[in-house]
Amino acid sequence: MENAHTKTVEEVLGYFGVNESTGLSLEQVKKLKERWGSNELPAEEGKTLLELVIEQFEDLLVRILLLAACISFVLAWFEEGEETITAFVEPFVILLILVANAIVGVWQERNAENAIEALKEYEPEMGKVYRQDRKSVQRIKAKDIVPGDIVEIAVGDKVPADIRLTSIKSTTLRVDQSILTGESVSVIKHTDPVPDPRAVNQDKKNMLFSGTNIAAGKAMGVVVATGVNTEIGKIRDEMVATEQERTPLQQKLDEFGEQLSKVISLICIAVWIINIGHFNDPVHGGSWIRGAIYYFKIAVALAVAAIPEGLPAVITTCLALGTRRMAKKNAIVRSLPSVETLGCTSVICSDKTGTLTTNQMSVCRMFILDKVEGDTCSLNEFTITGSTYAPIGEVHKDDKPVKCHQYDGLVELATICALCNDSALDYNEAKGVYKKFGEATETALTCLVEKMNVFDTELKGLSKIERANACNSVIKQLMKKEFTLEFSRDRKSMSVYCTPNKPSRTSMSKMFVKGAPEGVIDRCTHIRVGSTKVPMTPGVKQKVMSVIREWGSGSDTLRCLALATHDNPLRREEMNLEDSANFIKYETNLTFVGCVGMLDPPRIEVASSVKLCRQAGIRVIMITGDNKGTAVAICRRIGIFGQDEDVTSKAFTGREFDELSPSAQRDACLNARCFARVEPSHKSKIVEFLQSFDEITAMTGDGVNDAPALKKSEIGIAMGSGTAVAKTASEMVLADDNFSTIVAAVEEGRAIYNNMKQFIRYLISSNVGEVVCIFLTAALGFPEALIPVQLLWVNLVTDGLPATALGFNPPDLDIMNKPPRNPKEPLISGWLFFRYLAIGCYVGAATVGAAAWWFIAADGGPRVSFYQLSHFLQCKDDNPDFEGVDCAIFESPYPMTMALSVLVTIEMCNALNSLSENQSLLRMPPWENIWLVGSICLSMSLHFLILYVEPLPLIFQITPLNLTQWLMVLKISLPVILMDETLKFVARNYLEPAILE
């Protein structure tokens, strides 16, 4: 039923053709069940294990590697001679890499539990309904409830469907609907129509929503929506429709993969075509097909060389290390790629309650009457320090601490706060914090009593558990609470009837009242001044109300409560406590004692974090279900708005936002910094508009209602105290619910990206070198300098360790003084591309040169001519060009060993070059990153391992080197440092002075 909240009870019952006392007939139930289906959320069809595995192979680079492995396997199958076993090593290693990669990918996907499934935990198992087949209420499975059913709910129940209340069977009905609205204070419900068809869920006071909890009271209602038609069902549909965006890093790596695959394909084809003339060379036995296959193998080796196989593992390791560092700062990252996305966050949309504020109501101001003369009066105003539930704070008057027992009015005010109250403070030993037990508003009053200590109770030596309610206990020993007149909407107040624990002639029964100021003060005939009471005159009333209005609408927008007493109440037996309509009669002729103003105060550290965001070019937007006045006041206190800043077109309510045209809504999202009284759908819409401006949005949330927006935004941030649905829909969970933790995580994300750029460039320059090496050997007609199994070893192990260590580079000092980077900015641009191409060409040329040196110039080498080396495939005994040359020398492992050793050593030098993008090694020495030094030592040790420990040399087709050969390796390798230092010097001084580190 649409807009059931706007209809009267009779209209709703008439729509379903149902009687409140008897319920639906079985025939009606059957028809309605057929029409609307079961009252449950459909289960989400998850991906099968096979689908998840296949997904891991959709990446282009992975497919190229898979193809290379398959081709290598086929070629190895037909291999003859000694190389039969070693030929299988390459496809086996490639497949091993791909399998490991797929396992990690599948595990991560399985680990990200389905947020849609988590919604089901809010579905109650049973419900209580009235139906015509039974005279009394019956318990049935909640999934069998249909629209039109008459449902009974009571305290502790979970609401089984969306229900329009028809009658309330208790004084009040309080509902905790925080999972849907995000607001922690329970809501008082009624049965009157709410005429506004566009009312937000918070304002539909005559509706109960599926999955919410009854905090107090008992009521009956008619079901108006079930299953996916409920509010929680709409959230589920929105989540199903929300596609997960790929992170900027994933998009970059996808683009890089596509470009690389095109380059690889071109080079492979080019190498094959260049050598068509050699297909018939004698070494291939004159067989054109065998020659074609030989060069096809070289093309496959090229593909293996060009792909940085170690990159996925290094990126995963770097992100995992980043998540550990973030966890220490209370940011628990659930999705690894999002660590890097945090670095380019340009907008943070934050909840107010609990994130920007403490979510711990505290009284910060109060007043009592000082003097009254006719229509004029003066007040004693006090401020209270301390912004949490900890019973630690002072009462100040004119900025100086005061002793509360010196003021009779404060003693009485504390007595009302302690007795007209059902809450308590509770010390949580495990977490070492004070928590509320009961309503937030009442806990604030309990905490105030502890800070006031009106009877000067000795508090030293008490444990924290004893300290929690020490001062309240003293007051409760003096008077005993007999009964409570519950809060009701008509009088907007509640009261308690108390009798003295030690009766005497002077002490008598009293009623203590607290409630909304306008309601309570209208029923006050007198006013307390010190220990006397004087009549309340219109002038005094006006003065008191003007102060209360000022507190409620000023810079703090405090929530005010008036406190009063009834000095001569009726006796209990004279009251009718069954009918709450009579309560207002018993709460008249009151004496006004004072007023307290409370708020959910901003966290102390938030203002500095908001300032840091401004420096870093990040816009902070507050999004809250609270009213606009309170939201703007908090924004001013924490620096989102200036103290006197005009908030027109910068702060909107959900209603105001809906009334704008789509283009005006888009403009609003470009400038706004505060959205109040919003619904979940607004959050998703705001994220969409921000994304249309290419903003990278971090969105916080804790309720079920926030899940679609958390899923839609680039970075969904759930609260540690939030619902399971919010957590599973998010990329990150704040263990401490603190806004400042988000800012610390953004800083970490920026540092991680900078380090990632360094190691990605490092790995790519290595791959460029390998490609140049293989291309040169093929183009010059030299014997193979590097084979695929060696390239895999270098790409995975030797390069992988220093690349991982580059993830430990210290962050720049000015990292949060720069604007967010453009997510579309390429990983490697212009000058840097030239730099890494130049270095790569040197790496390739040096590797080929090292192999050629052994053939042409080495003392222990064959000393063949350049012509003989470049035409080695024509070598045979009857060829005069190769007279005196043993053709087997061209298959010696020495040139390969020289090439591999030069490649490894140059890469270690290159790792040192990557310590900083533009800073010289003289300014930033290697020991700035001790992990890098350690990883270089480990990589070289592993290289010695495969050189000198059997049977590894056989697998890698290499052989140990002597000292002369090692000295030549160093002579060829070390110039790469000088070369990069020169390029850095040019960059620093001529090309990119703005990037000076």
From Swiss-Prot:
This is Sarcoplasmic/endoplasmic reticulum calcium ATPase 2. Keywords: ATP-binding, Calcium, Calcium transport, Disulfide bond, Endoplasmic reticulum, Ion transport, Magnesium, Membrane, Metal-binding, Nitration, Nucleotide-binding, Phosphoprotein, Sarcoplasmic reticulum, Translocase, Transmembrane, Transmembrane helix, Transport. Isoform 1 is expressed in the heart. Its EC number is 7.2.2.10. The chain crosses the membrane at residues 49-69, 90-110, 254-273, 296-313, 757-776, 787-807, 828-850, 897-916, 930-948, 964-984. Residues 787-807, 931-942 are annotated as: Interaction with PLN. Interacts with sarcolipin (SLN); the interaction inhibits ATP2A2 Ca(2+) affinity. Interacts with phospholamban (PLN); the interaction inhibits ATP2A2 Ca(2+) affinity. Interacts with myoregulin (MRLN). Interacts with ARLN and ERLN; the interactions inhibit ATP2A2 Ca(2+) affinity. Interacts with STRIT1/DWORF; the interaction results in activation of ATP2A2. Interacts with the monomeric forms of SLN, PLN, ARLN, ERLN and STRI1/DWORF. Interacts with HAX1. Interacts with S100A8 and S100A9. Interacts with SLC35G1 and STIM1. Interacts with TMEM203. Interacts with TMEM64 and PDIA3. It is a multi-pass membrane protein. Residues 1-48, 111-253, 314-756, 808-827, 917-929, 985-997 are cytoplasmic. Residues 788-997 are annotated as: Interaction with TMEM64 and PDIA3. GO terms for cellular component: membrane; sarcoplasmic reticulum membrane. The active site is at 351 (4-aspartylphosphate intermediate). The modification 3'-nitrotyrosine is found at residues 294-295. The gene is ATP2A2. InterPro entries: ATPase_P-typ_cation-transptr_C, ATPase_P-typ_cation-transptr_N, ATPase_P-typ_cyto_dom_N, ATPase_P-typ_P_site, ATPase_P-typ_TM_dom_sf, ATPase_P-typ_transduc_dom_A_sf, HAD-like_sf, HAD_sf. One of its GO terms (biological process) is autophagosome assembly. Belongs to the cation transport ATPase (P-type) (TC 3.A.3) family. Type IIA subfamily.
